[in-house]
Amino acid sequence: MMRRLIAIAAGVLLGGAMSFGAEFSLAHVFSSHMVFQRETSAPVWGWGEPGATVTVVPSWNGEEYSTTVDKDGSWKVHVSTAEAGGPYSVAVRCGSACIDLEDVLLGEVWICTGQSNMEMPIAGFGFQQVDGAREAIIGASEKAGRIRVFDLKTPKQTEPIADVDATWQSPTGGVCARTSAIGWFFADNLSASLGVPVGIIVNAWGGSRIEPWMTREAIDRAGLTEDEMAEILSVQEKADRWPETPQLIWNGRMAPIAGFAARGFLWYQGCSNMWQRYCYDKLQTSMVRLWRDAWGRGEMPFLYVLLAPYDHGDKDGRARPHFVQTQMRAAVTTPSAWAVCTETYGDEVTIHPSRKREVADMLALKALSSVYGIDQGIPVDYPTPSSYDFGADGTVTVLFDNVWNNLMSISRRRITGFELAGQDREFHPAEAEVDWDGQTVRVWCDDVPAPVAVRYSFRNWCGSNMQTSYGIPVPPFRSDDWEY
């Protein structure tokens, strides 16, 4: 199969003209072992001699879908996909040339994006391991009919490119070991629950900020203040060390696959933006809009992960919980966007927690309930406080929404992570217990006889351990609006 990686001239708009030579070719995101999104109109594109006729014939219906190569040498045709199944073949013809795709499946496609916690493979990072890795790798080959992987590794680009140098892969132990743990476990859960194949496009870059995943235009329309914009522009000075410059990852990894038929996005990012608690929600909202516009779906599902607790070199610091509250705010302002909480899945000594399966399972459960409308019997919406009652006896009573069953601590140990402050605004560790109704928590501290504020899990790391009886963690919260 003839392929080509083609750089686009500056100023070319996404989805518009893309100039290059006349050689007949197909974008790399279409290859043998791929998954087409089921029951939709899926675009297929490539390049060829202007004026030539290109015909795509999928074996699931035998129909011919034809188009003419544009003057700029690009072509695109939409193919109707059927219900889940396979393997199928797809023939792409142009004159006497033919590209044959084999072992093609119809099912669900999700695009997995973010930084290192999304990138972290089943095999782990050095001494940082993934729980369940051995079992996943050993059993990978048995899932060839259920899971397929397209792993993007394109370097950052200063201008948009038209194609990527990657190919779809059928799972083996080696493929599984190199694949995003979050992506793999998500696909495994979703495929088993839906009974259909699942393809994942893994597109993650360790250490990346959110800005490289956006165009400069998307950043401009995020509604940032002058100071916030100045801070973003200042990081370009460090672009040689980290992928931080706006648009670089968009150019090299998102633009080339934009429009590929998929159900939705997974996003696990934030560590590199953790000190932007005042504007990250605006950036994420604008990024989601950019992606949805590029895919032509105004409410394409967007599922993302709240940052887990970690020392960050200052375990008593509060940058992380402030940032998590900003992440939570973005879910409220963005339609068809849902966050999952990882507050009890963190690790004090590593920024890459090992419990990737639990996070992926929560993403899958949220997708099943909110995207596919399937009740799995485990509510995954995280509990949030609905009211605070500061009693005269010094006890603070916190009532929660979205509990669904009972609040409890991990392994029924003493609840940790609460703090109280009095008029001096100095926070002290507090005791807490769940009331008989399972949805109310009483908090007290001998050092704070007259509390005026209560916080939970409001440190970078404090060993907080409260969750529902279904194992859904409670995210950081606070009753005050103080600056720190």
Region roles according to the model:
Residues 1-5:
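Positively charged n-region of N-terminal signal peptides that target proteins for export
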Residues 22-484:
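Cell-envelope and extracellular/periplasmic
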Residues 7-17:
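Bacterial N-terminal signal peptides
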